């Protein structure tokens, strides 16, 4: 398959590299790392095995990438409104779009722009960061929870097959709203406490009794909000 990766940071770069390693034609939209990846390729350090993609298809604009079978958009949620102009040049008649992003209200925007039939949501449960330009450090986990915007089982099976071909653990969520709240149960407590604590890591939070209790209380609050939201949407998943 041809795959365009928009927002090729640590997350998009890692999963795109996995798919490229599996033999797919993956093209990356890079900004900061463009020159380094063109010159030295993309290197991944991972508990699943280190690897180096010596020749990587990279571009500085989505127009250079062109239409693809799949678009993986892994922008930050704060950049959601810029996604349309970045993704549009990569969309052909049969292109599917995977919004590999955190937060709520992601898929409705993509559905509005491109049509719900081609849109998927994806939530990455992974510990990962970028090192020097063109280097990605995968530390732990790696599962992606996916769901089609119209809950089409056949579409979900197609995306699941694509991701698993790249040795990516993939789970089809009961529904997208459930999956997004599930991810927020982690993001809201730990991202918030990390920033409030001056950039402290997860292990520091878990190792401090007071911070751990704060994280647990925040998680319980997110669960309550999520379940209330799912009830209002008449979702059977809790």
Predicted regions and their residues:
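Short alpha-helical
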Residues: 32-36, 78-79, 104-105, 154, ...
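Rossmann-like NAD(P)(H) cofactor-binding subdomain of soluble oxidoreductases
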Residues: 52-135
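Active-site-adjacent beta-strand anchor residues
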Residues: 5, 27-30, 73-74, 99-100, ...
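Internal alpha-helical scaffold of NAD(P)-dependent oxidoreductase catalytic cores
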Residues: 89-90, 109-118, 133-236
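Nucleotide donor/acceptor-binding cores
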Residues: 1-2, 69, 142
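NAD(P)+-binding Rossmann beta1-loop-alpha1 motif at the extreme N-terminus of oxidoreductases
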Residues: 1-50
